[in-house]
């Protein structure tokens, strides 16, 4: 896709370039994306729990009890494929999409090295464009740590709704916007603890749960669950809890009718 086309889509070119420059770091578990590797088991398990709890289908071969196994999954803003690969390993048929060409090269190479080519593929396409041609084609859609990096997150949420089959589950994650999240996600994570590169986040783009709820409701999703993601810098331990002051995930469902 030409750069001028990307510029016309819902994307901040500077954000794409920022992550493209870090493409070589995606699978370095102690590098720039170490935090994503550390939180991935938590978010993966929570995604699967919500699929088991909320997924509904008339297809007897795709039951909720099976979790991700056998489901057709779309990972929006997949980056280097950390979450995409982990879902494929749990038996899902996964498509990852991103606008960072270097990210996708890193993701595709690692998928090939991991022998996951049969159940995992990547595409360089905006989610809105995919929604125009593949509406209702996915059982599960994930969009993690991406909404706070785009100009119009509501359009992303709406596209996720369109891509889901009725009864499907969508899981979204982002960062709350308040003084505590600024202190933890920017001052703490980027400047004090150096968990993330400086400039990774823009506080103005953070999204409150109420704002994300409204985006989901406007897209006609039904809320299923919400959870906060927490970190203790002393013990270097991550965990999930009800407090959503900083990082959080929500699970929503596309109604059957």
From Swiss-Prot:
InterPro entries: SAM-dependent_MTases_sf, UbiG_MeTrfase. GO terms for molecular function: 2-polyprenyl-6-hydroxyphenol methylase activity; 3-demethylubiquinol 3-O-methyltransferase activity; polyprenyldihydroxybenzoate methyltransferase activity. Its EC number is 2.1.1.222, 2.1.1.64. Keywords: Methyltransferase, S-adenosyl-L-methionine, Transferase, Ubiquinone biosynthesis. It is an enzyme of class 2 (transferase). GO terms for biological process: methylation. It catalyses: a 3-demethylubiquinol + S-adenosyl-L-methionine = a ubiquinol + S-adenosyl-L-homocysteine + H(+); a 3-(all-trans-polyprenyl)benzene-1,2-diol + S-adenosyl-L-methionine = a 2-methoxy-6-(all-trans-polyprenyl)phenol + S-adenosyl-L-homocysteine + H(+). Disulfide bonds: none annotated. Pathway: Cofactor biosynthesis; ubiquinone biosynthesis. S-adenosyl-L-methionine binds at residues 43, 77, 98, 144. Belongs to the methyltransferase superfamily. UbiG/COQ3 family. This is Ubiquinone biosynthesis O-methyltransferase. It comes from Psychrobacter cryohalolentis (strain ATCC BAA-1226 / DSM 17306 / VKM B-2378 / K5). The lineage of its organism: Bacteria, Pseudomonadati, Pseudomonadota, Gammaproteobacteria, Moraxellales.
